[in-house]
């Protein structure tokens, strides 16, 4: 996110944000329009509790990203640190893609962290979809341009190395 120039009033949504501290950091940096979506109401409640009074500055959305109604052409940044890789069904990924593209403003950004093609095939006991820069770019189609992509490693508390892929895309074409 630091590599993107966003105004403090930019609309940001964090998909699968749950107990992530990204919302804390965005508030500290002065961002004014933050939404956090997660399927777990418990995870969102933990974040609200952690933030205290600041939690009132955030729009909290409980729901499945594939089913929740999101505003059209609203967001300047769609951030997903750990949700898309759980979409192992191609139809689910097509719905996800449609949600992303419909809810982004023209010129909006997509920041996604997923498991790399040589990353683990399961997370929290569930199967995951792994991606290369090319396959992730293909998922979003021709109206989205890759700004940056990078593979990196993470060491789990158990000492296992996991390979991740982080990509930043920008909506450059017409909405579909």
Regions found by a protein language model. Give the residues of each.
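Class I (Rossmann-like) S-adenosyl-L-methionine-dependent methyltransferase catalytic domain
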Residues: 1-73, 87-103, 108-176
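A conserved beta-strand element that flanks and buttresses the S-adenosyl-L-methionine
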Residues: 79
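Short catalytic micro-motifs in class I SAM-dependent methyltransferases
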Residues: 82-86
């Amino acid at each position: 996110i630091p590599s993107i120039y966003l105004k403090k009033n930019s609309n940001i949504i964090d998909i699968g944000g749950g107990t992530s501290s990204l919302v804390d950091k965005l508030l500290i940096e002065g961002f004014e329009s933050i939404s956090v979506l997660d399927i777990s109401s418990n995870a969102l409640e933990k974040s609200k509790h952690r933030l205290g009074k600041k939690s009132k500055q955030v729009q909290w959305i409980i729901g499945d990203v594939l089913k929740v109604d999101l505003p059209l052409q609203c967001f300047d940044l769609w951030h997903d640190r750990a949700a898309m890789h759980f979409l192992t069904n191609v139809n689910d990924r097509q719905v996800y893609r449609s949600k992303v593209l419909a809810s982004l403003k023209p010129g909006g950004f997509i920041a996604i962290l997923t498991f790399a093609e040589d990353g683990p095939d399961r997370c929290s006991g569930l199967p995951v979809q792994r991606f290369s820069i090319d396959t992730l770019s293909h998922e979003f189609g021709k109206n989205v341009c890759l700004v940056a992509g990078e593979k990196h490693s993470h060491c789990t508390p158990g000492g296992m190395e996991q390979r991740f892929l982080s990509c930043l895309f920008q909506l450059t074409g017409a909405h579909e």
